[in-house]
Regions:
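Hydrophobic/aromatic residues within transmembrane alpha-helices
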Residues: 15, 52, 64, 118-119
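Histidine-centered beta-alpha loop that forms part of the nucleotide-sugar donor binding/catalytic region
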Residues: 18, 63, 108
Length: 167
């Protein structure tokens, strides 16, 4: 089942995160579909820019932590080197950073966790009138993910990055 809709109109490829019933919560499937779409965009000369947006009332509410327990069941599979994805948001963030086409975030509603961090390597971020950005890692007792500890200070400055990451 596709969780990212793609549309190419007038040289602009629009990627729409399409899980509105879950506020477009991020999954490994979504990560792979986005990476694949960025690969297609880079390979297609008809694509001049990429816009990433969310369906419904949110851009992306962060990682889908309620998506089931199958990732936690087999402890052996979670060991380093066992082929598991540890930071899907980081893989996506680096893919966007390595891209050849300009990327614009069109933010509607909430952009939390990976929903905020995936935007950091994008060239522009445009927001609706009432967006909600959340770098909630400190409140969750986890370290910032998706390469945000590298990108965030470069986008907003070290002082603002520290404030956003720790409060």
């Amino acid at each position: 089942m596709a969780v990212v809709r793609t549309d190419l109109t007038g040289g602009v490829m629009t990627l729409t995160l399409d899980r509105p019933e879950k506020l477009n919560a991020f999954t490994i499937e979504m990560m792979q579909e986005l990476i694949d779409a960025f690969d297609v965009a880079d390979a297609d000369d008809a694509v001049r820019a990429v816009v990433v947006t969310g369906a419904g009332r949110a851009f992306c509410a962060g990682a889908d932590i309620f998506g089931g327990t199958k990732g936690f069941v087999d402890v052996e599979k979670r060991k380093v080197g066992a082929g598991t994805v540890r930071d899907g948001g980081g893989l996506l963030t680096l893919r966007i950073f390595d891209g050849l086409k300009p990327v614009i975030a069109a933010v509607n509603g909430a952009a939390v966790g990976v929903g905020a961090t995936m935007q950091l390597p994008m060239d522009m971020r445009l927001a609706s009138e009432d967006p909600k950005f959340g770098f909630v890692f400190g409140r969750r007792g986890i370290v910032p993910e998706a390469c945000s500890s590298w990108f965030l200070p470069r986008v907003v400055g070290i002082s603002k990055a520290m404030e956003w990451s720790t409060t």
